């Protein structure tokens, strides 16, 4: 469809059949596998995208890979993405049938495909990446390189995300805060950022080091838009991990893992933010098979007991 930053361009948009590339003919001949590979893939029997999607799906059928994160998805047309998705769905079923004793063989979820397209966000809606490209989720650039709002104003984002994402089970957004392409979302209270991100509706991802307070590369210039010299892409801070911050992110992350309502449920504010009691909200989820409800408070003062009214979900005596 187009070339990315001068990198070689596979003509996936062309539908005519092509022969096996000379470089592979040479490689397979030298390996002594040419006849075997031609018998498997054919010679002059498919388009560029036919070959590429077949080869990529072999990672799935051979190793049981159950998902791809596809970078710069806009550089490949939707039909080729859909072709890849369909082949990978079939390949994963084959792997599970052929490897019944291996981990993941008894899972029933189809192959998952997440796409990345710069500036794509919740406002992009349930667009052609989903309907034509076969993507299950798209990365959400809404918060790229930016901290999430304070507890006093985060209800609007929670409500918007829940209303937009969780009203359509085929529309998924993968949200993050820090990025190697924009900035590290650092504030004086990264524990709160962990709470806000882990309690966000939809899917979330942790960019390495957000949970441990990783810094940029010392002494390396940063231009504010991706970083000159890749200062944002510093090594993981294994020797200087903020253990208190990590423990908090792990605690809230575990809560999210244990409660599907956090990411997939409907959102309701219980009490607006107050400096003395924080901000309290509920999430409810029921798909007819699984039912889950939670109430959470964030932004409350440290080391202070607060009373939370849970009667909207649980009556007295509920265990």
Please provide the spans of the model-predicted regions.
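Substrate-binding/active-site clefts of carbohydrate-active enzymes
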Residues: 1-63, 84, 88, 93, ...
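Short, surface-exposed alpha-helical recognition segments that flank or form part
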Residues: 43-47, 185, 240
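Acidic/His-rich catalytic or pseudo-catalytic neighborhoods
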Residues: 45, 170, 176
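Active-site-proximal helices and loops of the catalytic beta/alpha 8
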Residues: 54-173, 186-189, 195-200, 212-318
């Amino acid at each position: 469809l187009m070339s990315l930053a001068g990198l070689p361009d596979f003509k996936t948009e062309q539908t005519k059949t092509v022969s096996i590339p000379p470089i592979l003919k040479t490689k397979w001949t030298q390996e002594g596998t040419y006849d075997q590979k031609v018998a498997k893939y054919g010679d002059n029997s498919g388009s560029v995208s036919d070959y590429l999607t077949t080869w990529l799906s072999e990672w799935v059928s051979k190793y049981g890979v159950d998902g791809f994160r596809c970078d710069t998805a806009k550089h490949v047309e939707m039909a080729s993405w859909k072709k890849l998705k369909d082949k990978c769905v079939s390949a994963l079923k084959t792997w599970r049938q052929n490897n019944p004793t291996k981990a993941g063989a008894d899972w029933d979820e189809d192959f998952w495909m997440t796409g990345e397209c710069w500036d794509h966000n919740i406002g992009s809606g349930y667009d052609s990446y989903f309907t034509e490209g076969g993507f299950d989720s798209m990365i959400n650039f809404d918060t790229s390189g930016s901290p999430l709002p304070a507890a006093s104003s985060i209800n609007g984002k929670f409500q918007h995300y829940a209303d937009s994402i969780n009203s359509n089970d085929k529309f998924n957004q993968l949200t993050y805060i820090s990025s190697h392409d924009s900035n590290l979302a650092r504030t004086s209270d990264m524990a709160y950022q962990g709470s806000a991100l882990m309690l966000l509706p939809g899917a979330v991802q942790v960019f390495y080091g957000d949970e441990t307070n990783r810094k940029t590369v010392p002494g390396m210039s940063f231009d504010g838009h991706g970083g000159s010299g890749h200062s944002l892409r510093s090594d993981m801070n294994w020797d200087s991990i903020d253990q208190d911050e990590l423990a908090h992110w792990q605690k809230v992350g575990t809560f999210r893992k244990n409660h599907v309502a956090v990411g997939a449920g409907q959102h309701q504010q219980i009490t607006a933010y107050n400096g003395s009691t924080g901000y309290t909200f509920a999430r409810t989820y029921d798909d007819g098979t699984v039912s889950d409800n939670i109430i959470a408070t964030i932004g409350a003062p440290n080391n202070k007991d607060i009373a939370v009214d849970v009667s909207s979900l649980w009556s007295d005596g509920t265990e």
